[in-house]
C-alpha cells in the first residue's frame, strides 16, 4: 500500500460501547496475536464475547486461566472438531476440544484437550451454536450464560 496501515483489535464494554483496551500492530500481525495482548488488560469476573474469527483453543484457554473467573463465549466455527462428554440440559453439553499438534507447539502448556460448554440457542428462528468457558452448569445455568442475540450475531447458524 502507498500509505501506512495498522491492524487493531479492541475490547468494548457491551452496554456502554466504550472501548476498554486495544492492541495494534502491522498488517503482518494476525488478529489472534493482537488479541493475546488484551489478555492481561482483561479484568477478573468478566465474560468476553468473541467473534468466530478468534477461535483458537490456545488463546481461549490462556484467556480463561489468566485470572479469576475470566470467561469467554464464541460462536462455534463451522467444521470445529469436538467430542461430547455429557449432556447438561436441553441444548447444553460439556464438550472436549481436541488440540492439534500445531496448537500444542504454539501453546506448550495447552495439553491434548480443552473442556468447554456447547450451548445451542434459537433466536429469531435461527439456531446458534456457542462455545463458552462457563462449564459449571450449577453456577451458570443455560438461561444465565449470556447466550443471547448479541452472542449469536456472528455465530454458526442453521435454519
Language-model region placement:
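Single, function-defining residue in the core of a domain
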Residues: 2-159
Amino acid at each position: 500500500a502507498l500509505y501506512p496501515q495498522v491492524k487493531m483489535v479492541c475490547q468494548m464494554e457491551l452496554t456502554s460501547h466504550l472501548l476498554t483496551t486495544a492492541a495494534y500492530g502491522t498488517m503482518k500481525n494476525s488478529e489472534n496475536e493482537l488479541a493475546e495482548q488484551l489478555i492481561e488488560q482483561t479484568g477478573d469476573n468478566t465474560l468476553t464475547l468473541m467473534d468466530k474469527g478468534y477461535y483458537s483453543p490456545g488463546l481461549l484457554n490462556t484467556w480463561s486461566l489468566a485470572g479469576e473467573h475470566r470467561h469467554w463465549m464464541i460462536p462455534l466455527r463451522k467444521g470445529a472438531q469436538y467430542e461430547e462428554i455429557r449432556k447438561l440440559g436441553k441444548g447444553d453439553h460439556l464438550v472436549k476440544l481436541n488440540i492439534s499438534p500445531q496448537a500444542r507447539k504454539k501453546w506448550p502448556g495447552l495439553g491434548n484437550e480443552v473442556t468447554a460448554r456447547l450451548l445451542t440457542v434459537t433466536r429469531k428462528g435461527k439456531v446458534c451454536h456457542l462455545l463458552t468457558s462457563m462449564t459449571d452448569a450449577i453456577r451458570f445455568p443455560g438461561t444465565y450464560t449470556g447466550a443471547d442475540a448479541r452472542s449469536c450475531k456472528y455465530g454458526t447458524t442453521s435454519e
